[in-house]
Amino acid sequence: MQKLKQQVFEANMDLPRYGLVTFTWGNVSAIDRERGLVVIKPSGVAYETMKADDMVVVDMSGKVVEGEYRPSSDTATYLELYRRYPSLGGIVHTHSTHATAWAQAGLAIPALGTTHADYFFGDIPCTRGLSEEEVQGEYELNTGKVIIETLGDAEPLHTPGIVVYQHGPFAWGKDAHDAVHNAVVMEEVAKMAWIARSINPQLNHIDSFLMNKHFMRKHGPNAYYGQK
């Protein structure tokens, strides 16, 4: 697990590097599907002092199998998503400013241009709010459940992120680094959407044919963007 712990550590260190976290407001995890184990940032440990060996390994029930610290408080959310969507290899949660603002507003991040369409096939959805019973009960588990309720059976890698109402953004990818990459993009397109709608409140969504072109040329069966 040392290699995966190193990858998760590096991905976590990318969060402050890209300006996605303040203090310890975020974390990254990744899963080893063959072993059924998840590596995640320890709860509340400062990035300045954190080491790869500080990463915590849990099984799919959340039991710590390796590590001296408690795992992130978001562990139950991540495990619920890993169980439901086998294509996910890494997940990240932050409170990045602009994506969190859309979450607090209770609004999906609208697909307004090609930067968005290169990564997200449609709006980045916003979940419903959790009920008082859901919050007072198994809060983190129920956060995962409301994300799943919103995504349904859609391929999560086609829209690799979501904003949880009154909470903040979650993003995911094929591995930990891909998840962070998508979280960075989500924050940028959230900022772009806010600015664009401020300039033109009547701005419409990106044309569907342009959305399809930009997404499919990178992610479709006949993708031709980038190098093989």
UniProtKB/Swiss-Prot annotation:
Residues annotated as catalytic: D118 (proton donor/acceptor), Y225 (proton donor/acceptor)
Annotated coiled-coil segments of the chain: none
MF GO annotations: aldehyde-lyase activity; L-ribulose-phosphate 4-epimerase activity; zinc ion binding
Keywords: Carbohydrate metabolism, Isomerase, Metal-binding, Zinc
Gene Ontology cellular-component terms listed: cytosol
EC number: 5.1.3.4
Stated induction or repression of this protein's expression: Induced by L-ascorbate. Repressed by UlaR.
Domain of life: Bacteria
Reaction(s) catalysed by this chain's protein: L-ribulose 5-phosphate = D-xylulose 5-phosphate
SMART domains hit by this protein: Aldolase_II (SM01007)
Binding site for Zn(2+): D74, H93, H95, H167
InterPro entries xrefs: Aldolase_class_II_sugar_metab, Aldolase_II/adducin_N, Aldolase_II/adducin_N_sf, UlaF
EC primary class: isomerase
Pfam family for this entry, one: Aldolase_II
GO biological process, any: L-ascorbic acid catabolic process
Record text on cofactor binding: Binds 1 zinc ion per subunit.
Named cofactor requirement(s): Zn(2+)
Pathway membership: Cofactor degradation; L-ascorbate degradation; D-xylulose 5-phosphate from L-ascorbate: step 4/4
Binding site for substrate: G26, N27, S43, G44, S72, S73
Function recorded in the entry: Catalyzes the isomerization of L-ribulose 5-phosphate to D-xylulose 5-phosphate. Is involved in the anaerobic L-ascorbate utilization.
Family that this chain belongs to: Belongs to the aldolase class II family. AraD/FucA subfamily.
Protein name: L-ribulose-5-phosphate 4-epimerase UlaF
Species assigned in the record: Shigella sonnei (strain Ss046)
